[in-house]
Amino acid sequence: MQKISAPVKVFLWLLLVACMLILAKNILFKGRSGYERADIKKAFTSRGIKKRFAKANLKPFTTIRLFYKSRSLNTEYKMGNLVGNVVGFIPLGLLLPLLFNWKRGWQAVFGVFLISLSFELAQLLFALGVFDVDDLILNTLGGLIGYIIYWICRSIVRHQRKQEVAIN
């Protein structure tokens, strides 16, 4: 793959920062106007920590199955949660291999997994949400989809360049 020019690289970094800020707002600060001092104090009490660990979903596909089977939950809410967890991380699957010149798909997918894990741990540790392994699965799937899109685009560009070279 051809080297990315400095201005394009800066633009890609700005996109990554924007994506991370949007994800942080939607994952960590959803529905909050501010993180109060009282919230911080509660977050670090032993009772608060135990409560968050008790609420954490560590069993894969529990939330996904619940959403699939539930008749009482609003369909828009269920789809927004499931699809949002996937779609929100697609840009990372596209941007990470471009910014870090990762040649193998597992590197990009693992990078997305680590970012998702960071968000989930932040929710758990700072009482900003509930840790859910299903979110990790869906976020990582989004990263994989993003990488597949990157790979397809890269293949098309390579093919076009080969054709241009063959013509010249």
What are these regions (language model features)?
Residues 127, 131-150:
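Alpha-helical transmembrane segments that form the membrane-embedded catalytic/substrate-binding core
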Residues 1-128, 151-168:
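Bulky hydrophobic segments
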